[in-house]
Amino acid sequence: TDARQSNIPVVQMNEQYQLRISQHEIELDATTEIGVLRGLETLLQLEKNGKAPALQLYDAPRFSWRGVLLDPARRFLPFPTLLRQLDIMAAVKLNVLHLHLTDDQGWRFESKRFPRLHQLGGKQGYYTQQQLRQLVQYAAERGIRVVPEIDLPGHTTALGVAYPELMSQPGPKQPEKHWGVHPAVLDPTNEAVYDFLTELITEVTTVFPDPYLHIGGDEVLSEHWLGSAHIVKFMQQHQLADATALHAYFNQRLHSILQQAGRTMMGWDEITQGSLPKSVLVQSWRGVESLHQAAAEGYDTVLSTGYYLDQPQFAAFHYRNDPAPANRPLPDLS
């Protein structure tokens, strides 16, 4: 059954609060529990040696999506590390944990329907469904949503080790051990792929209640597609001019599967290369220009460019990356 619960934070959660500190009392007003949590975090930051400055403030977030992406797929992170990350996020009022669960280097989601995924793709570690449900609840108690990412159709070496019959070409034999973009890719002409994804995504929704499900969609190398005679024939039969058109065909099929599962598609900015509904959420990693282009086309967007914490930069560098700068107004699409 669908994992959605009443106590899970919603996308447009109300986080605003008012805090008044005088000589004799502290007053915190908020209309939601999450607003109270945010106000208490501010109070903790103001307190020093049992004292806090007299003030009156009204606080509400500028952006409704303030997230952190963790990548345990490439390097497995122990479960307590995920819980600690949620504590840290709550302290600085971040409200979305984007969990990158699958990639060429590993598969970290326990699938009871397709156990070979974690048995062969997660030998270095994976999270049980019980752990992930605990993570979702732990996050909810801190006003944080958890958005899972199942990367498709590329970044699928670990998937291909478990179910090679779903891939565009034979192999791979084992998950990748090195960083990089690898050629393994699902076969978008194989109906068994869509049957597999329908069951897998349904299973994922029983664990993660968030309305968004991230499907990756980035860095899809075309060599396995264009090097397969049956795929080239399929492209010709369906008037798909190139690999970009084939990728768009796959995304459209995947979008329908997500709709049937009651989820909204989210993906990296390459997914805008096809005609997908404007309900799709686009995450830009290639640059601010792709973010503004997607927004101009009517998509909601999330910016990752400029916020890569694995690329050591001064804090000033990150603060210069404004998702909505005043000198670059977005179009009024109302």
Model-found features: residue ranges?
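Contiguous, structured surface segment used for ligand recognition
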Residues: 1-63
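Extracellular/periplasmic catalytic domains that process cell-envelope and extracellular macromolecules
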Residues: 20, 61-62, 207, 275-276, ...
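Alpha-helical scaffolding within the catalytic cores
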Residues: 51-55, 163, 288
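Substrate-binding cleft of carbohydrate-active enzyme catalytic domains
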Residues: 63-263
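Short secondary-structure transition/capping segments
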Residues: 108-112, 159-162, 277-281, 314-318
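Flexible, acidic glycine-rich loops studded with aromatic residues
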Residues: 264-270, 275-280, 286-334
